[in-house]
């Protein structure tokens, strides 16, 4: 990924290309109950049906594994990116993917996931998911890309995070332009439509 900032006027003037790949951030744990797994499964199927390539963190556990398996079972193309240290953990890496990129560390993982995706969607997850989303949002703020950044706020999962964003904006730490880059969707259909919006 070219990490040289572009002028903000250039980024804002760029038309978004029709996405061919979507990078999805989500938890390496399943979460409480079945609703999160069902959401990840639905997203995987929707991405495959939409003829989009799924890029994700390369694990076979938690929501990540559910997401990938659903896309694969629906005939989709799935690309995983995982740090080499994780490959030593039994059952961590998903070896049934279309492609699995093994990189040196977490920094390379995030950079390659960002480079390979034309859009970003965050499903429920923990601190790693939040970090990944905020990193690509920050890169958008800095003019490094013009890719849509979507929070899938199913069942108000991200309400506390959105409250933080609003509070930081009110207190002058997040600009209105950056706040507007956070695309909030309530369901899978809305998220897919959002990343395809010009």
Curated annotation (Swiss-Prot):
Catalytic activity, reaction form: N(6)-(dimethylallyl)adenosine 5'-phosphate + H2O = N(6)-dimethylallyladenine + D-ribose 5-phosphate; 9-ribosyl-trans-zeatin 5'-phosphate + H2O = trans-zeatin + D-ribose 5-phosphate
Disulfide bonds: none
Residues that bind substrate: 91, 109-110, 126-132, 138
Record's keyword terms, sorted: Cytokinin biosynthesis, Hydrolase, Plasmid
GO cellular component, one term: cytosol
Pfam hit, one: Lysine_decarbox
EC number from the UniProt entry: 3.2.2.n1
GO biological process: cytokinin biosynthetic process
Induction comment: During the interaction with host plants.
InterPro entries hit by this protein: LOG, LOG_fam
One Gene Ontology term of the molecular function aspect: cytokinin riboside 5'-monophosphate phosphoribohydrolase activity
Entry coiled-coil feature ranges: none
Leftover remarks: The FAS-operon encodes genes involved in cytokinin production and in host plant fasciation (leafy gall).
Entry function: Catalyzes the hydrolytic removal of ribose 5'-monophosphate from nitrogen N6-modified adenosines, the final step of bioactive cytokinin synthesis.
Protein name: Cytokinin riboside 5'-monophosphate phosphoribohydrolase
Species of provenance: Rhodococcoides fascians
